[in-house]
Curated annotation (Swiss-Prot):
SMART domains: DIL, MYSc
GO MF terms, alphabetically ordered: actin filament binding; ATP binding; microfilament motor activity
Lineage: Eukaryota, Fungi, Dikarya, Ascomycota, Saccharomycotina
Disulfide bonds: none
Gene3D superfamilies named among the record's database cross-references: 1.10.10.820, 1.20.5.190, 1.20.58.530, 6.20.240.20, Kinesin motor domain, Myosin VI head, motor domain, U50 subdomain
GO cellular component terms, A-Z: cellular bud tip; cytoplasm; filamentous actin; membrane; myosin complex
Entry keyword set: Actin-binding, ATP-binding, Cell cycle, Coiled coil, Motor protein, Myosin, Nucleotide-binding, Protein transport, Repeat, Transport
Name of the protein: Myosin-2B
Subunit structure comment from the entry: Homodimer. Interacts with calmodulin (CMD1) and the myosin light chain MLC1 through its IQ repeats.
Positions that bind ATP: G169, E170, S171, G172, A173, G174, K175, T176
Length: 1419
C-alpha cells in the first residue's frame, strides 16, 4: 500500500464504523513507519507500524492500517463493482452518499441494494416510471427495482427460461413493499403490451387476474403479518409467489408457497409487539351485533392479545384495513358465509386463550363449565366435556391397553396453546390452498409455459435470545447464501472465459460445513427429530447429544459450546456467530396435538372447520407419502416434524431456484427508529455483512473487480499516452478494435509496472483492486501539469495584449489631447463673436419691451374707463326696462284674468267633446292592430306601423303582379266576349292599383314629416350649443349646464332613432321605388330560399380553394378580398333582416378554416394561419354573436399555435419560423404589437419546453449542456433584439437561469446561496432535480456533499409546504385572441365596398351560380 502525504483513506471507528481521513505525515525512522491521519472532523490519529503491506494487528502493535479511499468521482457510483478500492468502508460510503441524495437503489454487480427511506416516495413507482423502465436494458437507466423486474421479464420472453427474484433482508427493510411493486410492474407492463396490440378481450381477462393476484397481498398480510419492535408490518412467514405465463407470455394465474409460519406468535407476544393483524381488524371492523354473536369485546380482554401492551399502531386504522381484507377475501373467491365462519374460528381462538386451567399439587384441572371454554366450543362446534378432558389428560397406547394419565399444569397450558396453534396454522394453510385453487385452476395448469417467482423471505436474524424460529430462518439464509456465492462465482468465471484472459481459481469462504452441520444424516435437525419422537425426549438430553456429537473436530469449527450453561449452543454462520437457547426446541419442533385432541377437533359440527381439517389431513398424507418415497422405513407413518417439513420445503425451493435464472434484491433497514432519511452506519454495516453483499465483494476482489470498455478507458486516460498519440482521440477519428487494444496497451505498459495487475480481454480491460485509483492519481497530476502550461501561455499572451493595448491607448490619448486643445481655441473665438452679437440683441430687446409695456398700460387704462361707462349705461337701461315691464304686468292683469276664465270654460267643453270622440275612436282602434296605440305615443310606434304597412303593400304588389300576369295571359288567349266579361275584374284591379298609389303618397308624406322632425332636432341642438357658448355670466352658465346635458342625451337618442328610421326608410323607399320590377324581392329570395347554395359557394369554394396572396401585391383589397366579400354579403343580409342566415355563414366559415389548418402541410400552415388570424379579426366588428365568434377565433388561434410548436424542433427551425411570421405579419398589414404578442407566446412555449427537457429527458447533465443551451438561447434573443421584441429575456428566464446554474461553479454553501440569488425563478425542488443529474467533466470537481444535502433538505421542506410543480406548463390553454389583439381597436367593417365589384372579381374558370346571379341583380 502507498500512504504518501495527501492520500485519502478510511479508518475504523466504534461510533460511525469508518471515518474519512487524510495522511498528513509519513516518516520512516528506525525501521518503523510513523503515520499521522487527520480525520474530516480534525482529529489526529497516530499510527506506528513496521509493515505497510499488512493489516495484521499482531504485527502492528494492535493497530490496524487504514483502508485506501476511492477518488471522489467514484464515491457515489451507481454500481459498487466499479469502485477502484472495493472494500467495506467504500461500499458503505457509496450507499450512504446515494441515500443522502435520495437515491435508495444501488447496484452491486448482479445484486440490487434497496435502502428503506421510511418516507412516501410514490413518484419512484408511478406509471410514468414503469413506462420509462419498460423495454430498457438495466445499464441504460438508473438503479431501480423496476430494472430488475424488467430484466427478469425480458429474459423470460427472449430466452423462454423461468425466472426468480429473491427479495431478502431483515424485518423492516422493505421486503414486502418491494415484492408488491414487482408484482405491480409485471401487471402494468403486460397490460400495456396488450393495450398496444388492441386485444380488448385479453385486457378484460387480465384485469380480473391482476386484481386477484394483487388481492392476495392484503389477505396474506392480515393472516401472516404482525407488529414487531423492528417493523409495524413484519411478515412472520416466507412466501414464494409464482406469476404464471402461457406460451404467448400472457399472465394466466399465480401460485403461492409459504414457509415456516411463526405459530408461537399466536400464544405469546413480547412487549410492544402484537399478534397477527387479523384479530385487531376483526375487533375494529365487525358490527356490534356480530361481536355479540361472537362474544367479542376489546383486545385488552383477551390473553392472546394483551401480552404485548399497546394494541394499536400509529397511523394505521384497523377498521379500514378490515374492509380491505374483506374485499380481498371476496376477490379471491371466499364468500361472505365462509368469511363469517372464519371469524367464528378466530374468535374461538381468542376464547381458548382465556380458558382458565387451575393448578393442583401434581396435576391440572379444567371445568367443563368454564365460560371461555363454553364460548370457544360453541363457536367451533365441539363438545365442551371431551374438549376439557383432553386438555388436562393424555393417553398412551400400548400393544395391550390404553393408559390415561393427568397432565401437569405447565403441560396443560402447552396442550391448550398447541390446539390453538394447530387450528390457526391449519386455517392459514387452508387459505393459501384456497387462493392457489382460484388463481391456478386445472385449466391454467395445463397451459403453464413459464413463470416468474418472487421470493419474499426473512433475512438473517440475530437477537439477544434466539430460538427454533431463528434457527430455521438462519438455516434458510445459509442455503440461499451458498447458492448466491456459487452463482456469483460462476458468473465471474464465465466472464473471464468469455473475455479469454489469464486467471487463476478464485477462493472464497464456503459455508458448506455449516449447512452439513444442520442437515446431514447426523446433523442438528436429525438429532432434533430423533429426540422429538422419544416419549421422554427433552431439550436437555438433546443438548447433551449435540455436545457429544459436534463439539469435536471437524464439526467444532462451526459448532461451539458456551463457557457457561448447558442450555445453549453456538453455530458459526456466514454472517456472525449466533447463540441459540435450546428451551422449547423439542416442543416447537413437534408442534402438534395428541391423537385424542385431534379426534375431538374432527368431531366438529362447524362445516368450515371440518373442511380445514380435511385439507390439513390431506396435506399431511402428501408429506408422509413423499417422505416414504425417499426413506423406506417402518417409521414412515409417523407424523412429520416441523423441522423435517421445513427442510423438505427448503430443498424443493432450492431445486426450483436452481432451475431458474435468479435475480437478487437485498433490502437494507437504515435505522431502528424508522425515521425518514436517517442513515445508521453501524446498523447498515451489520446488514451488509449479514445479507452477503460484502462476501460477494470479497469474491470480486479476489479476481479483477474493475473492468472498463476500451472506448471508455481511452476517453478517460488518453492523456497518459504521448502527446503525438492524442490526435486520434481528440479529432474523433474512428479506431478499429486492434487500434484501441494497441492504444490501451501502450498506456498500461508505460504506467503500470506489473502485468499481473491488469488483463486485456476481447472487449474489456480487467483491473486488480487499486489500479484505477493509481491511474486516476497520475491522470490528475498530468492534468495539473497541462493546466499550468496552458496558464503560462495564456498569461503571457494576456499581459502582452495589455502592453500593446496600453501603448495604443497612450497614442490615442495624445491625439485626443491635441484635438481637444484645438477645439478649445476655436470654441473661444466663436464664443467671443457670439457674446458681441448677444449684447447687441439684448439691448434692442430691452428697449422694445419698454415701449410695448408703456402701450399696454395705456390700453388697460382706456379699457377700464370704457368698462365703467358701459356698465353705468347698462344699469340705467335695465332699471328703465324693469319699470316698463312692471307697469305692463299691472295693466295686463285684469284682461288676463278674464281670458283665463274664458279659456278654462272653453277647454272644459273641448275636453268633453274630445272625450266622446276618443271613446268612439277607442272602440275602432281595439279592432285594429295594437301598433296604432304605440304610434300615438312614440316614434317607435311609427316604425312598427310603417313596417306593417310596407309588408301589406309588398303583399298587395305581389298580388297585383299575379293578377296583372293573369290578366295579360287572359288578354292574349281569350276571345273578345270573354274579355268583355272580365271588365269588372279589370276595374277592380285599377281600383286596387290606385289605392296602392295613394298608400305610397301617404308613406312619402309620413317620411317627409319624419325628416322635418330630424331637422328640428338638429336645429335645436345647434341653438343650445350656441347658447352655451354665448352666455358670459358664469352663474347662469352653471345653472343651465345640467339642463343642457339632459337635452343633449335626448337629442343623441333622437339621432340614433333617426338613423335607424332613415335606414328603414331608405330600404322601404327602395323597395317601393323598385317594387314594380321586383329586384329587391329577387335578392331576398336568393338570400332566404337559396341560403344553402349561397353558403356552399361562399364556404366550400371561395374560402377553401382560395390561395394566400403572393408577395408583390400591395392593395388591401387584394390581400383581404375574401373577408371583404364575406362582410359585404353579411351586411347585405343584415340589411334585409336575415341575421340568422348571416350567423350560419360566419360559423361555417370559421369551422371549416379550423379543419383545413389542422390537416395542412407544415410549411403552408404558418402563412395560411397568420393570414386568417388577421382576417378573422376584421369580422369582430360585425354584430354577429361576438362571444361565439371569439370562441371560434380562439380555437383557430390555438390550433395554429400547436402547428407552430410542432415545427420548433431545433434552434434553426425556430429562427426560420420567426422570420416567416415577422415577414408575413407586416406583409398582411399587421402591427408590430401583433408581431410582439405572437413571438411572446412562442417564447413562453420555448421556455417551458427547453426547461422540461433539461429536467426530464436528460439522464445526466454537465456544464457543456448548459453552454450549448445558452448559445441557443442567445441566438433566439439576438433575433428578438434585432426585431425589437420587448422583454424577450423575461420570457426565457427559467431555461436561461437553469443554463447558468449548470455553468456556475459551486464549491460551498456560500457559492450556492449566490447562485440561488441569480436563479431566483427556480425553486429548490427544480434546482435539486438539475444538480442531482449533474455529472462533472474530467477537469471539474464534483459538487460538495454538504451543498447537495442542504439542497435536499430545502427541497423537501418546499415540497411539503409550497406544493410547487416541478415542470412548467407548455400547453396552449392560456393563449387567446383577446390577449393577442389587446390594445388594438377593431376596424369597422366597410359597408361602402362595392359588392358587385367584388363578385365580378371571381375566377372565370370557376362556376358560382348563386353568387353571380346575386351580382347581376345588384348591378
Amino acid at each position: 500500500m502507498s500512504f504518501e502525504v495527501g492520500t485519502r483513506c478510511w479508518y475504523p471507528n466504534s461510533e460511525a464504523g469508518w471515518i474519512g481521513c487524510e495522511v498528513t505525515k509519513n516518516d520512516f525512522q528506525d525501521g518503523t513507519y510513523h503515520i499521522e491521519l487527520t480525520s474530516e472532523t480534525g482529529l489526529v490519529i497516530p499510527i506506528e507500524t513496521k509493515h505497510l503491506e499488512s493489516n495484521n494487528a499482531m504485527e502492528n502493535n494492535h493497530e490496524f492500517l487504514p483502508v485506501l479511499r476511492n477518488p471522489p468521482i467514484l464515491e457515489a457510483t451507481h454500481d459498487l463493482t466499479t469502485l477502484s478500492y472495493l472494500n467495506e468502508p467504500a461500499v458503505l460510503h457509496a450507499i450512504k452518499e446515494r441515500y443522502n441524495q435520495r437515491n435508495i437503489y444501488t447496484y452491486s454487480g448482479i445484486v440490487l441494494i434497496a435502502t428503506n427511506p421510511f418516507d412516501k416516495v410514490e413518484e419512484l413507482y408511478s406509471s410514468e416510471m414503469i413506462q420509462a423502465y419498460a423495454r430498457k436494458n438495466r445499464d441504460e437507466m438508473a438503479p431501480h427495482i423496476f430494472a430488475i423486474a424488467e430484466e427478469a421479464y425480458r429474459e423470460m420472453i427472449n430466452n423462454d427460461q423461468n425466472q426468480t427474484i429473491i427479495v431478502s433482508g431483515e424485518s423492516g427493510a422493505g421486503k414486502t413493499v418491494s415484492a408488491k411493486y414487482i408484482m405491480r410492474f409485471f401487471a402494468s407492463v403486460e397490460e400495456e403490451h396488450f393495450n398496444k396490440e388492441g386485444d380488448s378481450k385479453h385486457q378484460e381477462e387480465m384485469s380480473d387476474i391482476e386484481v386477484k393476484i394483487l388481492a392476495t397481498n392484503p389477505v396474506m398480510e392480515a393472516f401472516g403479518n404482525a407488529k414487531t419492535t423492528r417493523n409495524d408490518n413484519s411478515s412472520r412467514f416466507g412466501k414464494y409467489l409464482q406469476i404464471l405465463f402461457d406460451s404467448n407470455k400472457n399472465i394466466i394465474g399465480s401460485s403461492i408457497k409459504t414457509y415456516l409460519l411463526e405459530r408461537s406468535r399466536l400464544v405469546f407476544q413480547p412487549t410492544s409487539e402484537r399478534n397477527y393483524h387479523i384479530f385487531y381488524q376483526m375487533l375494529s371492523g365487525l358490527s356490534s351485533d356480530m361481536k355479540k354473536q361472537l362474544y367479542l369485546t376489546n383486545a385488552e380482554d383477551f390473553f392472546y392479545l394483551n401480552q404485548g401492551g399497546e394494541s394499536t399502531i400509529n397511523g394505521i386504522d384497523d377498521s379500514l384495513e378490515y374492509s380491505t381484507t374483506i374485499e380481498s377475501l371476496s376477490t379471491v373467491g371466499i364468500d361472505t358465509e365462509v368469511q363469517l365462519q372464519i371469524f367464528k374460528i378466530l374468535a374461538a381462538l381468542l376464547h381458548i386463550g382465556n380458558i382458565e386451567i387451575k393448578k393442583t399439587r401434581t396435576d391440572a384441572t379444567l371445568s367443563s363449565t368454564d365460560p371461555s371454554l363454553q364460548k370457544a366450543c360453541e363457536l367451533l362446534g365441539l363438545d365442551p366435556l371431551t374438549f376439557s378432558k383432553w386438555i388436562t389428560k393424555k393417553q398412551i397406547n400400548t400393544r395391550s391397553e390404553k393408559i390415561i394419565s393427568n397432565l401437569s399444569f405447565n403441560q396443560a397450558l402447552v396442550a391448550r396453546d398447541s390446539v390453538a396453534k394447530f387450528i390457526y396454522s391449519s386455517l392459514f394453510d387452508w387459505l393459501v390452498g384456497n387462493i392457489n385453487n382460484v388463481l391456478c385452476t386445472s385449466q391454467v395448469s395445463e397451459t403453464i409455459n413459464s413463470f416468474i417467482g418472487v421470493l419474499d423471505i426473512y433475512g438473517f436474524e440475530h437477537f439477544e435470545q434466539n430460538s427454533f424460529e431463528q434457527f430455521c430462518i438462519n438455516y434458510a439464509n445459509e442455503k440461499l447464501q451458498q447458492e448466491f456465492n456459487h452463482h456469483v462465482f460462476k458468473l465471474e468465471q464465465e466472464e473471464y472465459v468469455k473475455e479469454e484472459i489469464e486467471w487463476s481459481f478464485i477462493e472464497f469462504s464456503d459455508n458448506q460445513p455449516c449447512i452439513d452441520l444442520i442437515e446431514n444424516k447426523l446433523g442438528i435437525l436429525s438429532l432434533l427429530d430423533e429426540e422429538s419422537r422419544l416419549p421422554a425426549g427433552s431439550d436437555e438430553s438433546w443438548t447433551t447429544k449435540l455436545y457429544q456429537t459436534f463439539n469435536k473436530p471437524p464439526s467444532n469449527t462451526v459448532f461451539g459450546k458456551p463457557r457457561f450453561g448447558q442450555n445453549k449452543f453456538i453455530i458459526s454462520h456466514y454472517a456472525v456467530d449466533v447463540t441459540y437457547e435450546v428451551d422449547g426446541f423439542i416442543e416447537k419442533n413437534k408442534d402438534t396435538i395428541s391423537e385424542s385432541q385431534l379426534e375431538v377437533l374432527k368431531a366438529t359440527t362447524n362445516p368450515t372447520l371440518a373442511t380445514i381439517f380435511e385439507f390439513s389431513e390431506a396435506e399431511n398424507k402428501t408429506n408422509i407419502t413423499e417422505q416414504a418415497g425417499t426413506i423406506q422405513r417402518k417409521t414412515i407413518n409417523r407424523k412429520p416434524t416441523l423441522g423435517s417439513i421445513f427442510k423438505r420445503s427448503l430443498v424443493e425451493l432450492m431445486e426450483t431456484i436452481n432451475s431458474t435464472n435468479v435475480h437478487y434484491i437485498r433490502c437494507i433497514k437504515p435505522n431502528t427508529e424508522k425515521e425518514a432519511w436517517k442513515f445508521d452506519n453501524l446498523m447498515v454495516l451489520s446488514q451488509l455483512r449479514a445479507c452477503g453483499v460484502l462476501e460477494t465483494i470479497k469474491i470480486s476482489c479476489a479476481g479483477f473487480p474493475s473492468r472498463w470498455a476500451f472506448e471508455e478507458f481511452i476517453q478517460r486516460y488518453y492523456l497518459l499516452a504521448p502527446t503525438d498519440q492524442w490526435g486520434r482521440v481528440t479529432a474523433d477519428m474512428e479506431m478499429s478494435l486492434e487500434d484501441m487494444v494497441a492504444f490501451c496497451d501502450l498506456i498500461l505498459s508505460e504506467k503500470i509496472d506489473s502485468k499481473d495487475k491488469y488483463q486485456i480481454g476481447k472487449t474489456k480491460i480487467f483491473f486488480k483492486a487499486g489500479v484505477l485509483a493509481y491511474l486516476e492519481k497520475i491522470r490528475s497530476d498530468k492534468v495539473t501539469e497541462l493546466a499550468v502550461l496552458i496558464q503560462k501561455h495564456i498569461r503571457a499572451k494576456y499581459y502582452r495584449s495589455l502592453y500593446l493595448q496600453a501603448m495604443l491607448s497612450i497614442k490615442n490619448c495624445q491625439s485626443l489631447i491635441r484635438g481637444v486643445q484645438s477645439r478649445q481655441r476655436v470654441d473661444f473665438e466663436m464664443k467671443t463673436d457670439a457674446a458681441t452679437l448677444l449684447q447687441t440683441l439684448h439691448r434692442s430687446t430691452r428697449v422694445r419691451s419698454q415701449v410695448f409695456e408703456t402701450l399696454k398700460n395705456i390700453l388697460e387704462v382706456q379699457t377700464a374707463i370704457r368698462r365703467v361707462l358701459v356698465s353705468n349705461f347698462i344699469q340705467r337701461e335695465f332699471e328703465s326696462r324693469s319699470a316698463i315691464m312692471i307697469q305692463s304686468k299691472i295693466r295686463a292683469n285684469s284682461p288676463k284674468h278674464r281670458y283665463q276664465t274664458l279659456k278654462t270654460g272653453t277647454i272644459l267643453i273641448q275636453a268633453l267633446v274630445r272625450r266622446k270622440q276618443s271613446q268612439e275612436k277607442l272602440k275602432q282602434l281595439k279592432i285594429q292592430a295594437e301598433s296604432a296605440a304605440s304610434l300615438k305615443n312614440s316614434a317607435a310606434g311609427i316604425q312598427k306601423e310603417l313596417i306593417g304597412f310596407i309588408e301589406e303593400l309588398i303583399s298587395n304588389i305581389k298580388e297585383n303582379d299575379a293578377k296583372t300576369t293573369e290578366y295579360k295571359s287572359l288578354l292574349k288567349h281569350t276571345s273578345l266576349p270573354v274579355v268583355t266579361g272580365t271588365n269588372e275584374r279589370t276595374a277592380a284591379y285599377i281600383s286596387t292599383k290606385n289605392q296602392v298609389e295613394e298608400d305610397k303618397v301617404t308613406i312619402r308624406t309620413i317620411l317627409t314629416k319624419y325628416e322635418t322632425l330630424k331637422d328640428l332636432c338638429r336645429k335645436e341642438l345647434k341653438s343650445l350649443e350656441s347658447l352655451e357658448k354665448g352666455v358670459n355670466d358664469e352663474k347662469f352658465a352653471s345653472s343651465l349646464q345640467s339642463s343642457l346635458e339632459l337635452i343633449k342625451r335626448d337629442i343623441s337618442d333622437l339621432r340614433i332613432n333617426a338613423i335607424e328610421k332613415d335606414n328603414e326608410r331608405t330600404s322601404t323607399s327602395s323597395e317601393l321605388k323598385d317594387g314594380t320590377d321586383c329586384t329587391d324581392n329577387a335578392v331576398v329570395q336568393i338570400l332566404t330560399k337559396r341560403q344553402g347554395d349561397l353558403i356552399n359557394d361562399l364556404v366550400n369554394v371561395v374560402f377553401l380553394e382560395f390561395q394566400i396572396p403572393q408577395r408583390g401585391r400591395t392593395k388591401d383589397c387584394e390581400h383581404f378580398y375574401p373577408v371583404k366579400l364575406l362582410i359585404s354579403i353579411v351586411n347585405l343580409m343584415n340589411k334585409f333582416g336575415l341575421r340568422k342566415s348571416s350567423h350560419s355563414i360566419l360559423k361555417q366559415t370559421v369551422q371549416d378554416l379550423i379543419g383545413k389548418i389542422s390537416s395542412m402541410d407544415a410549411k403552408k400552415c404558418v402563412t395560411f394561419g397568420l393570414y386568417w388570424i388577421i382576417s378573422l379579426h376584421k369580422l369582430s366588428s360585425l354584430p354577429q354573436e361576438p362571444a361565439v365568434l371569439n370562441k371560434l377565433q380562439d380555437k383557430f388561434y390555438k390550433t395554429w399555435l400547436k402547428q407552430c410548436f410542432n415545427q420548433m424542433k431545433t434552434v434553426d427551425s425556430i429562427l426560420i419560423l420567426f422570420d416567416t411570421i415577422s415577414e408575413f405579419t407586416l406583409f398582411f398589414q399587421g402591427t408590430t404589437e401583433l408581431l410582439t404578442n405572437i413571438i411572446t407566446a412562442l417564447l413562453q412555449h420555448i421556455n417551458a419546453k427547453w426547461f422540461n427537457d433539461l429536467l426530464i429527458k436528460q439522464n445526466t447533465l454537465s456544464w457543456t449542456h448548459g453552454l450549448e443551451k445558452d448559445s441557443e438561447i442567445k441566438k433566439v434573443l439576438d433575433w428578438c433584439n434585432s426585431h425589437k421584441i420587448r422583454n424577450s429575456t423575461e420570457y426565457l428566464r427559467n431555461v436561461n437561469q437553469a443554463c447558468k446554474l449548470l455553468q456556475l461553479r459551486i464549491s460551498n454553501i456560500s457559492d450556492f446561496q449566490l447562485v440561488c440569488e441569480f436563479c431566483y425563478d427556480l425553486s429548490s425542488l427544480q434546482m435539486h432535480a438539475l444538480l442531482t443529474k449533474y455529472r462533472p467533466t474530467q477537469f471539474e470537481k464534483p459538487i460538495p456533499v454538504d451543498v447537495l444535502n442542504h439542497l435536499s433538505n430545502t427541497a423537501r421542506r418546499e415540497r411539503t409546504t409550497m406544493k410547487r410543480e416541478l415542470t412548467l406548463d407548455a400547453g396552449t390553454e392560456t393563449y387567446s385572441v383577446e390577449n393577442l389583439f389587446q390594445g388594438h381597436p377593431i376596424e369597422a367593417s366597410d359597408e361602402h365596398d362595392d359588392i358587385n365589384q367584388l363578385i365580378n372579381q371571381l375566377p372565370s374558370d370557376k362556376d358560382f351560380p348563386v353568387i353571380k346571379e346575386l351580382g347581376s341583380l345588384l348591378a
